[in-house]
Amino acid sequence: MGIGRRKLLAVGAAVLALPARADTFPSKQIRWVIPFAPGGNYDVTSRLVAEPMGRTLGQSVVIDNRPGAGGVVGLEAAVNAPADGYTIVMASFTVGYVAPIFAGKQQMLQLLAPVSILTTAPTLIVTRSDSRFPDIKTLLAEAGARPGTVTIGHPGNGTTNHVAILRLQLNEKLKFNIVPYRGSGPGINDLLAGNIDCFADQLTSSMPHIQSGKLRPLMNFGLQGIPDLPNVPTLKDAGCTPFEGGTTAGVFVRAETPKPIVERLNQGVVAGLKDEVVSKRLRELGAIVRPSTPEQFTEALKADEANVGELLKVGALKPE
């Protein structure tokens, strides 16, 4: 895929072709596209960061939710916008590369330039507090013994959550009835209504429901435990082959955007993440706050590319 090389060529061409006016950027409000419905991990994180980011840049940052096709609808809004820095989008490797596969489109990472990582959020399997599954081993045992009877939701085809479910199935020789949604918000609502058995969700969007007692976490897809939820087993604790299933997501802009404007956006995002109120709230929600340079974000994307490559190689990652 050559993410790094394509990015450098695209950004280099943009700097030669367009006048870099970072000294006057921004001169109007910035649109921050969220490729999922309100209430999920992306939405919660972006809304927290947008306000202090706007203060730093001197212009308001307006959230624009564009759910659909596992994030592809939102990504299309970003890549079809002018390459002037006034439209940014929150995404991850899986949303930019894998989700388009499920939508029958080309991968979109080559059309985007990374600005900064925002957070890494643990991914959990959560269920209702009154669920028939007392623990993760009971759920996995049923998924193995009675293929297709356990319904598990995720925020959209090709998302990190979806990839984690597919990898769990492959590693443990299980079969779930997998149900995609247009974001975590609708999926959690369906879970609470009793329409599905469990949901793969980021801790940032599930934590309020866990704290209220409405949801119960069954397992953490990460390699490390969660300090605020020490009793939630990891994959290894549950007797499964361990892998990292957390979500590292950040801000992107069109690849042709001049580098000085990308750097100015980076300053705004990093300032937003370092805001004391924002960073405290994100940590309370279980996220690891990770302000970065564009180059550091590119390296993180390469690591995710290697992880997803295993599933592509064995044919486990394809439209269902």
Q: Language model features by range: what are they?
A:
Residues M1-A13:
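N-terminal secretory signal peptides and thylakoid transit peptides that target proteins
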Residues G12, Q29, S60, N65, ...:
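Conserved functional loop/turn residues at catalytic and ligand-binding sites
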Residues A17-P19:
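N-terminal signal peptide c-region/cleavage motif recognized by signal peptidases
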Residues A22-L109, T149, K173-D197, P291, ...:
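N-terminal (or domain-start) structured segment
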Residues S27-Q29, Q211, D237, K259-E320:
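An extracytoplasmic/periplasmic, membrane-proximal ligand-sensing/linker region
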Residues N80-Y86, A99-P186, L235, T248-R281:
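Hinge/capping helix and adjacent helix->loop/strand transition within the periplasmic-binding protein
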Residues M90-V95, H154, S184, D201-S206, ...:
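Beta->alpha turn/N-cap motifs
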Residues T120, S206-K274, A306:
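C-terminal lobe and pocket-closing loops
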